[in-house]
Amino acid sequence: MTAIIILNWNGADDTLACLNSLANAEGEFVVYVVDNGSADDSVLRIQSWIDGHNEVDVQLVPLDRNYGFAKGNNKGLEVAARMSPDSYLLLNNDTEVLPDFLVRLQEFSVSHPEYRVLAPKINYFYDKNKIWNCGGKLAFGFRKYYYAGSPDSAVKENGHIDISFVTGCALFFYPELLDEHGHLLTERFFFGEEDFEFSMRMKKARVPMACVLDSLIYHKVGASGNKMHHSGKVFLHYLNRFIDVRLHNSTLFYVSWTVLNAPLCFRHFYKMCRTVSGSFKLMNRLFFDARKKDAVTREDFEALVIRNDYFKKK
């Protein structure tokens, strides 16, 4: 049996669409919808859906506040662990699945037990013949998606491909990967970066991972991110990544990686502020904060992408 964890935050429309697709899914599973302190009517709407659908086992786990993506999922895993499932699946609420997506993953996990982390092929929801990714690879602190933006016909392999990066959008794994607290994801980052950090840990530990190509889901890419202030979202991404790479590698590696990343950062910052001096100020702030911080907190997140007052603080 697979325990599926779905995190909801003010996103009942997407979550209910995801549940409707899971109601037709094959295989043995139970769904835990973790409401991450929604301020709207999400809890009432999701509970109403559960009460009216007996064909699928769905349990609602309401949290008292927004704990962020990683901690919210970890809290869901704590609850699901009480059922001692054979496997877990983290699934974004802005996805919709094909009926056989889960059983394809389950069957592959039985026939290829050496792979301890699996991912389905993920296509765009609004362009269903276009691939978002088939996992990816990590190299020198960089991530590259496999088949990103390619048509379905571009995938020639049968069965699976080995990967070293897996997105948190759909992450199938075995219980032994949970830590002593029953958690999977780092809680250093309130929003974002958790899948990159997880993939770095798995690569270091030599944990085999694969994308199962005949398992398919659709993703409404960026649904939660659409609510964020754009410039803050860009800075948040780089701050998360710089801290993550620094903490996982030597000083020499981090400095070399920073030099390689600097032109890309500058280009993105220049698109945001349209001045050279403003771009350099953002670069300097990024480098300073990435050296001083070991985590990106909820306060940092809200200052960057909600209130847009992060740069008013020293």
Briefly describe each language-model feature range.
Residues N20-F29:
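Short, acidic, metal-binding catalytic loop of nucleotide-sugar glycosyltransferases
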Residues P62, K71, E96-H183, R188:
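Acidic/His-rich active-site region of diverse nucleotide-sugar glycosyltransferases
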Residues S84-E96:
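Short beta-strand-to-loop acidic/aromatic patch adjacent to the donor-nucleotide binding site
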Residues G232-N240, S250-K314:
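Non-catalytic, C-terminal membrane-associated alpha-helical segments of glycosyltransferases
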